[in-house]
Amino acid sequence: MRQKIFLFVRSLIILYLILFIGEGIAKLIPIGIPGSIFGLLILFIGLTTQIIKVDWVFFGASLLIRYMAVLFVPVSVGVMKYSDLLVSHASSLLIPNIVSTCVTLLVIGFLGDYLFSLNSFTRLRKKAIKKRDINNVNNKGEAS
């Protein structure tokens, strides 16, 4: 029991420390990117370079992910509270969201097409096509 408490406290301290460092960077560099995003980038870089061990943050992160839906309840209540404001500004909210979604889909589509056209991705492309063909055969067999 003490071991689990230690793991939980250690992982939360590390996660919050990274969050506060990200908030500090966001205050030092006022470019409109939230501190939590800087914190996520620091965490990502730390995990990929293995400066931060996965075991150090796994217990707290998995607990937070498990209860993520509960953590979004206040946000949902806030959206419902200001629904009249959202409806009155619907066009100024929806148009940028739709445009940015379409641009993102196009960029990802072209990037994927480019990456799959490279010679180094030939093996990956063959593997993906083989998996797709197997899924198509299985789906046709289930439909009959």
Curated annotation (Swiss-Prot):
It is found in: Cell inner membrane. InterPro entries: LrgA/CidA, Uncharacterised_UPF0299. Keywords: Cell inner membrane, Cell membrane, Membrane, Transmembrane, Transmembrane helix. The chain crosses the membrane at residues 5-25, 28-48, 57-77, 92-112. It is a multi-pass membrane protein. It comes from the Bacteria. GO terms for cellular component: plasma membrane. Coiled coil: none annotated. Belongs to the UPF0299 family. NCBIfam families: PRK01821.1. This is UPF0299 membrane protein MS1271. It comes from Mannheimia succiniciproducens (strain KCTC 0769BP / MBEL55E).
